């Protein structure tokens, strides 16, 4: 792919960097490298510090290594952050901060070959890591009625999932995005936005195991952050945001056992910085429509 054909604008870039409170000597992780927008900003603020940037998309890693200055204190790691990574298995240090930007990059969305968009008639792929075997096409043509219905209801919140799945099974094999859109146009045309939006979201989440990966990555981050380190997360739909809110609440709330004779109030692992999600400004939403659904949440490590 010629990366010059696609233009990506990082969402809430300044706000995310400000919330991280970068220390020049600190050690940081950008858990979702993407098109390097946040990575470059973090690296430019480091002096004696270092940044580890992760991405499971080999194309993103390759482009980053070509684009980034070799003098910047960065190591690019082709891996999803939740998988046993170099920093969690071989490095004996703690982190001063970690950033998760959970959105797809414009390069992934706008590249027809990746199969993420319902606006192009391309093979139903949707893999962020092209080395994995499961594609959206495989799921549509091989999953059972119950499995597909569950995916669409849980990950897409599709109201008439049964009708959609019945037609998918009837029309098998589905090969391209337009094969699927022809079905969603008939059975999902009353939902807000494009008829295929929620179906494609559900498939993408299943293909890449996005929600399970997020849960594991958040839990892993707790073990790597030093006291006063910050975790900054930018989400783009309610399913992600729900997981983040639950994680922050779970680790910032202490439930006193009923049988304890005295009230002990220990320090919780996290304190929440953003009591409500921080949203893009009106100006940013006007300049970058893909920022409209973004929510930023921040917590600080206590112990």
UniProtKB/Swiss-Prot annotation:
<protein>
    <recommendedName>
        <fullName>Ribosomal RNA small subunit methyltransferase H</fullName>
        <ecNumber>2.1.1.199</ecNumber>
    </recommendedName>
</protein>
<feature type="binding site">
    <location>
        <position position="81"/>
    </location>
    <ligand>
        <name>S-adenosyl-L-methionine</name>
    </ligand>
</feature>
<dbReference type="InterPro" id="IPR002903">
    <property type="entry name" value="RsmH"/>
</dbReference>
<keyword id="KW-0808">Transferase</keyword>
<keyword id="KW-0963">Cytoplasm</keyword>
<dbReference type="GO" id="GO:0071424">
    <property type="term" value="F:rRNA (cytosine-N4-)-methyltransferase activity"/>
</dbReference>
<keyword id="KW-0698">rRNA processing</keyword>
<comment type="similarity">
    <text>Belongs to the methyltransferase superfamily. RsmH family.</text>
</comment>
<feature type="binding site">
    <location>
        <position position="101"/>
    </location>
    <ligand>
        <name>S-adenosyl-L-methionine</name>
    </ligand>
</feature>
<dbReference type="InterPro" id="IPR029063">
    <property type="entry name" value="SAM-dependent_MTases_sf"/>
</dbReference>
<dbReference type="Pfam" id="PF01795">
    <property type="entry name" value="Methyltransf_5"/>
</dbReference>
<dbReference type="GO" id="GO:0005737">
    <property type="term" value="C:cytoplasm"/>
</dbReference>
<feature type="binding site">
    <location>
        <position position="108"/>
    </location>
    <ligand>
        <name>S-adenosyl-L-methionine</name>
    </ligand>
</feature>
<feature type="binding site">
    <location>
        <position position="55"/>
    </location>
    <ligand>
        <name>S-adenosyl-L-methionine</name>
    </ligand>
</feature>
<keyword id="KW-0949">S-adenosyl-L-methionine</keyword>
<dbReference type="GO" id="GO:0070475">
    <property type="term" value="P:rRNA base methylation"/>
</dbReference>
<comment type="function">
    <text>Specifically methylates the N4 position of cytidine in position 1402 (C1402) of 16S rRNA.</text>
</comment>
<feature type="binding site">
    <location>
        <begin position="36"/>
        <end position="38"/>
    </location>
    <ligand>
        <name>S-adenosyl-L-methionine</name>
    </ligand>
</feature>
<dbReference type="InterPro" id="IPR023397">
    <property type="entry name" value="SAM-dep_MeTrfase_MraW_recog"/>
</dbReference>
<keyword id="KW-0489">Methyltransferase</keyword>
């Amino acid at each position: 792919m010629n990366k010059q054909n696609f233009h990506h604008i990082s969402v809430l870039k300044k706000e995310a960097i400000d919330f991280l409170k970068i220390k020049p000597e600190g050690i940081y992780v950008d858990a979702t490298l993407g098109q390097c927008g946040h990575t470059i900003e973090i690296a430019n603020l480091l002096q004696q510090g270092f940044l580890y940037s992760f991405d499971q998309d080999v194309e993103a890693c390759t482009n980053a290594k070509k684009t980034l200055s070799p003098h910047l204190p960065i190591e690019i790691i082709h891996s999803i952050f939740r998988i046993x990574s170099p920093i969690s298995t071989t490095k004996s240090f703690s982190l001063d901060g970690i950033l998760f930007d959970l959105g797809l990059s414009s390069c992934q969305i706008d590249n027809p070959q990746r199969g993420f968009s319902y606006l192009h008639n391309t093979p139903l792929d949707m893999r962020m890591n092209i080395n994995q075997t499961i594609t959206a096409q495989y799921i549509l043509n091989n999953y059972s009625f119950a499995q597909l219905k569950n995916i669409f209801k849980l990950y897409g919140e599709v109201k008439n999932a049964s009708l959609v799945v019945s037609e998918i099974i009837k029309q098998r094999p589905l090969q391209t995005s337009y094969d699927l859109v022809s079905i969603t146009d008939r059975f999902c045309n009353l939902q807000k936005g494009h008829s295929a939006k929620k179906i494609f979201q559900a498939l993408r989440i299943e293909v890449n195991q996005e929600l399970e990966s997020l849960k594991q990555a958040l839990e892993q981050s707790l073990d790597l952050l030093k006291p006063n380190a910050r975790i900054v997360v930018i989400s783009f739909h309610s399913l992600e945001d729900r997981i983040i809110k639950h994680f922050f609440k779970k680790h910032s709330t202490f439930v006193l056992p009923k049988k304890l004779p005295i009230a002990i109030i220990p320090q919780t692992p996290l304190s929440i910085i953003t009591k409500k999600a921080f949203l893009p400004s009106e100006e940013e939403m006007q300049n970058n429509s893909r920022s409209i659904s973004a929510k930023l949440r921040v917590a600080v490590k206590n112990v």
